[in-house]
Amino acid sequence: MSSRENPSGICKSIPKLISSFVDTFVDYSVSGIFLPQDPSSQNEILQTRFEKPERLVAIGDLHGDLEKSREAFKIAGLIDSSDRWTGGSTMVVQVGDVLDRGGEELKILYFLEKLKREAERAGGKILTMNGNHEIMNIEGDFRYVTKKGLEEFQIWADWYCLGNKMKTLCSGLDKPKDPYEGIPMSFPRMRADCFEGIRARIAALRPDGPIAKRFLTKNQTVAVVGDSVFVHGGLLAEHIEYGLERINEEVRGWINGFKGGRYAPAYCRGGNSVVWLRKFSEEMAHKCDCAALEHALSTIPGVKRMIMGHTIQDAGINGVCNDKAIRIDVGMSKGCADGLPEVLEIRRDSGVRIVTSNPLYKENLYSHVAPDSKTGLGLLVPVPKQVEVKA
């Protein structure tokens, strides 16, 4: 029977269509991106291990700076001037810390989600990870939030609540959940002009919050890609013994609000946790615990290097412990060190190299700042011509 012969079938679908339209309207108002809801992804198993791709690109901490985030993707040839995916079958791992220190955190989350979908259609893949700042924000720890960051979430909350009001006008839809349920109207020892931004941020990012559930539940906390293991801070043997898949699923369950309450699992909290560890990312190589690193790597079959963010490397992307630890946080966000974007590239046929936007390399690869004489960087890039420079 056709829809013309059975108009009731069309009528029954109208509430869902209206709900979808409202969600898309809210998304565009917040981010400038049309991003249809993708409910099926919420039920997918969070994959931990991946085969080595032909081309793998690793990107460090982004911290609320959309302009620098775009630049990092552009120098790697992953997007065009209209932010469309051009990376083909490339696999990308972004090691976390999208949140805090900048005012475009939500825009980056939408930007990454859009690119994930475009990459999948082209045969590529983008993995996003949880950093310590994602964990902190889900817990309600906003020490590193900026004024613009509060404003961005307040704008989101205004649109989100407007969307909910629009849905209540449509019979046939369940009453939307109040995102502010249980959140106090004010906070002691806090400026009154911050109240609404803080409330909006709690509403969005707490366990089972709309933004946490939609975006952050898709994040890995640990990922093994070919012969590399990715983590925001670092992995110790005890974390690996606990189980990498187990860590990913438990953190995801906590973000979804299934268990654990306000605070993250213990292995995500404290100085020796997977998102806070700095044993392998200290800028001074002699301070890195290479023995602990080698022990950890030896417990993951087939893995020969650990790639991490978390600690800003003033010298740029570099390796220590015979390149078994590669540190890729270059502090690119203007809220951090305003560093020049760099990304790590691993090709199956030609190994590891650094792609940088640093104009000094472009001017004279054999100058005093050539990579073979740059502290730390030379450990990864033995000869200058292995550095690719993009404007």
UniProtKB/Swiss-Prot annotation:
Location of the active site: 133
Keywords annotated in UniProt: Cytoplasm, Hydrolase, Manganese, Metal-binding, Protein phosphatase
Residues binding Mn(2+) 2: 97, 132, 232, 295
Enzyme class, spelled out: hydrolase
Signal peptide: none
Main location: cytoplasm
CDD domains (alphabetical): MPP_Shelphs
Single GO MF descriptor: phosphatase activity
Keyword Cytoplasm: yes
Cofactor: Mn(2+)
Expression tissues: Expressed in roots and siliques (at protein level).
Subcellular location: Cytoplasm, Cytosol
Induction of its expression: By infection with the bacterial pathogen P.syringae.
Record has Metal-binding as a keyword: yes
Phenotype on disruption: No visible phenotype under normal growth conditions.
GO cellular component annotations of the record: cytosol
Cofactor binding note from Swiss-Prot or TrEMBL: Binds 2 manganese ions per subunit.
Positions of Mn(2+) 1 binding: 61, 63, 97
EC number(s) reported in the record: 3.1.-.-
InterPro entries: Calcineurin-like_PHP_ApaH, Metallo-depent_PP-like, MPP_Shelphs
Gene3D superfamilies according to UniProt: 3.60.21.10
Family: Belongs to the metallophosphoesterase superfamily. SLP family.
Task of the protein: Shows phosphatase activity, hydrolyzing the artificial substrate para-nitrophenylphosphate (pNPP) in vitro.
Protein name as it appears in the record: Shewanella-like protein phosphatase 2
Source organism (scientific name): Arabidopsis thaliana
Upper taxonomic lineage: Eukaryota, Viridiplantae, Streptophyta, Embryophyta, Tracheophyta
